[in-house]
Amino acid sequence: MSESSEKTGTTHFGFRQVAAKDKKTLVAEVFTSVSRRYDLMNDLMSLGIHRAWKRYFVATAQVKSGDRVLDLAGGTGDIAMLLKNRVGAEGSIVLGDINASMLSVGRDRLIDRGVVAHLDYVQCNAEALPFQDKCFDLVTMSFGLRNVTDKDTALCEMFRVLKVGGQARVLEFSTVTAEWFKPIYDFHSFQVLPRLGRLFARDAASYRYLAESIRKHPPQEELQAMMGAAGFERCRYRNLTGGIVAIHSGYKY
């Protein structure tokens, strides 16, 4: 079930209940604020492990040379950079992000690293993708779905633009599975992380929201069911690092 309420027109922004129409603006303010320090944010949130998670996410994707890939919530280009090696010179990647600041950081970073060929940048909303039906072999979203207002619609859009036989993959912070670890994780998320955000980025509020958004994100089984409801088949998930993150995948047949 999507986090938006059709009856009240409200949704969650972290632990706050806000008008659904306002969430995009509030999320945009967060990511505009953290865009120049996005990698630092991920390091603080994951204790630096996010790079290994992303490498595994791409390494286990169904993608081959010549494929056309859509990377949603492409951020600073980490996933696109890894995918470029998989699709090769014959393939292409579209890096999409709703936030112009994030997209700019990603473009500059990839250009600085010499990654320019067969790579397009599109500012787009995952709930209303500006692409034709059945035009991508793989659709990925890394650490972005929890910030989407209507997750069900976004998953349906991912399904729509995917070719028959293609795969969608979502890498996202999830629900920790080890009971003994939950108090430690909560302490890091709600006590340590905002203080680090204030110290290194002068922005405790954005980091507090990001921690809260993880707790409001659907747990593994629920998100798997949501992907099935969007039309995907063979929906699976794999927990990494005790469920701190999970990789969800589904196919279009």
UniProtKB/Swiss-Prot annotation:
Job description of the protein: Methyltransferase required for the conversion of demethylmenaquinol (DMKH2) to menaquinol (MKH2) and the conversion of 2-polyprenyl-6-methoxy-1,4-benzoquinol (DDMQH2) to 2-polyprenyl-3-methyl-6-methoxy-1,4-benzoquinol (DMQH2).
Pathway: Quinol/quinone metabolism; menaquinone biosynthesis; menaquinol from 1,4-dihydroxy-2-naphthoate: step 2/2; Cofactor biosynthesis; ubiquinone biosynthesis
Coiled-coil features, chain-numbered ranges: none
InterPro entries in the cross-refs: SAM-dependent_MTases_sf, UbiE/COQ5_MeTrFase, UbiE/COQ5_MeTrFase_CS
GO aspect biological process, one term: methylation
SUPFAM superfamilies tied to this protein: S-adenosyl-L-methionine-dependent methyltransferases
Protein name, UniProt field: Ubiquinone/menaquinone biosynthesis C-methyltransferase UbiE
Assigned EC number: 2.1.1.163, 2.1.1.201
Chain sites annotated for binding S-adenosyl-L-methionine: T76, D97, N125, A126, S142
Catalytic reaction equation(s): a 2-demethylmenaquinol + S-adenosyl-L-methionine = a menaquinol + S-adenosyl-L-homocysteine + H(+); a 2-methoxy-6-(all-trans-polyprenyl)benzene-1,4-diol + S-adenosyl-L-methionine = a 5-methoxy-2-methyl-3-(all-trans-polyprenyl)benzene-1,4-diol + S-adenosyl-L-homocysteine + H(+)
GO molecular function: 2-methoxy-6-polyprenyl-1,4-benzoquinol methyltransferase activity; demethylmenaquinone methyltransferase activity
One Pfam family linked to the record: Ubie_methyltran
Domain of life: Bacteria
Family affiliation: Belongs to the class I-like SAM-binding methyltransferase superfamily. MenG/UbiE family.
Gene3D superfamilies cross-referenced by the UniProt entry: Vaccinia Virus protein VP39 (3.40.50.150)
Gene, per the UniProt record: ubiE
Keywords: Menaquinone biosynthesis, Methyltransferase, S-adenosyl-L-methionine, Transferase, Ubiquinone biosynthesis
